[in-house]
């Protein structure tokens, strides 16, 4: 009986030890899960867009949505109005880990994945319907290109239709060649277009444009931007004229670094992707509306829209576009394969019966 008693005690002790170890392991697991759930990730995000604009309000809504839906696990520090510098400066800070993301124009996008800028090639698309169609088709390629180069693409907003704005009248392409036109410093797409057009532009950071327009003997008298951008950046107050038919429909991107994105738990990654896409879509639709409204506001403030390209001008512009495309292909900034893919998509889209009536190239902002 004694032997049986000791055997029973030993068995009970072993069982108690197993239960004890299991409880300890469970407690550790739960505490680790709680720590993960409570970890706060701070997203430092920068944009050139000034505060108080329609875009900045949409970004503020995005920040609020992220922080609420993450239950405070993501906090966003927003740096608006170019306080972190021009887009190349912001990208350098992201790569160094000082920032984590930003809202960029095509200029900044080109420094991450340049083939995406086929979407803002001058005079390539006849309408936003065409650019929307092609964008949807090549978006998987663009997202993969961003990811390969260290970034996650969250959303795809739109800057909108780009016009020349000047202190001088513009009535011909020759007039354009005689202007002191700003070039966003370091922009290969702008460089290629102006080279093909035989224009000698003045390269400046976007941060210096307003100063030079304001100066009595400033280095530039002409810029290019959207109608909404001319107001948001206050450039319109120093200008008098604008071209009616725009050059292109400029793109934008909402991005975060893979370094930041990959640290997030899966649910927070999905939250960023879902809300970022929605913000990009909201800004794109808002930009189209704001650009339409801005035409009237600019006219009320003394901006005269002029120069509806005639057929000869348009043929020359298309030749300039093709020459610029050749330069960009030679440097592999936008590879020939991307141009060919885009042109094939456009041809197929234009050949649809419902699109046969849209034969004329008309990049005027939609009514």
Annotate each predicted stretch with a short phrase.
Residues 38-130, 146-367:
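N-terminal secretory/targeting leader peptides
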Residues 21-31:
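Bacterial N-terminal signal peptides
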Residues 33-37:
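Sec/Tat signal peptide C-region and signal peptidase I cleavage site
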Residues 31-32, 70:
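Short linear Ser/Thr-Pro motifs
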Residues 2-23:
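Bacterial N-terminal signal peptides that target proteins for export
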């Amino acid at each position: 009986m004694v032997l049986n008693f000791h055997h029973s005690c030993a068995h009970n002790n072993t069982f108690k030890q197993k239960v004890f170890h299991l409880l300890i392991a469970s407690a550790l697991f739960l505490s680790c899960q709680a720590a993960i759930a409570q970890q706060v990730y701070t997203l430092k995000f920068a944009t050139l867009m000034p505060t108080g604009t329609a875009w900045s309000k949409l970004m503020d809504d995005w920040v609020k949505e992220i922080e609420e839906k993450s239950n405070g696990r993501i906090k966003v520090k927003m740096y608006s109005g170019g306080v972190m510098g021009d887009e190349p400066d912001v990208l350098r800070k992201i790569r160094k880990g000082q920032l984590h993301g930003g809202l960029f124009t095509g200029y900044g996008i080109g420094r991450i994945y340049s083939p995406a800028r086929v979407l803002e090639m001058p005079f390539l698309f006849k309408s936003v319907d065409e650019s929307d169609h092609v964008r949807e088709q090549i978006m998987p390629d663009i997202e993969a290109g961003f990811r390969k180069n260290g970034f996650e693409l969250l959303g795809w907003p739109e800057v909108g239709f780009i016009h020349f704005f000047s202190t001088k009248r513009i009535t011909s392409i020759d007039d354009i060649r005689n202007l002191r036109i700003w070039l966003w410093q370091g922009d290969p797409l702008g460089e290629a277009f102006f080279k093909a057009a035989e224009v000698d532009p003045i390269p400046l950071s976007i941060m210096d444009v307003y100063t030079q327009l304001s100066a009595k003997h400033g280095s530039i008298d002409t810029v290019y931007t959207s109608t909404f951008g001319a107001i948001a950046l206050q450039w319109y107050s120093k200008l008098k004229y604008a071209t009616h038919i725009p050059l292109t429909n400029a793109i934008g991107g909402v991005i975060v670094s893979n370094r930041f994105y990959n640290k997030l738990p899966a649910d927070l990654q999905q939250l960023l992707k879902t809300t970022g896409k929605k913000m990009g879509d909201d800004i794109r639709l808002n930009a189209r509306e704001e650009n339409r409204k801005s035409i009237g506001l600019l006219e009320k403030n003394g901006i005269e829209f002029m120069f509806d390209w005639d057929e000869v001008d348009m043929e020359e512009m298309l030749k300039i576009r093709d020459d610029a495309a050749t330069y960009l292909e030679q440097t592999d900034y936008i590879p020939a394969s991307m141009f060919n893919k885009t042109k094939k998509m456009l041809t197929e889209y234009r050949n649809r019966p419902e699109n046969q009536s849209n034969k004329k190239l008309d990049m005027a902002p939609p009514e």
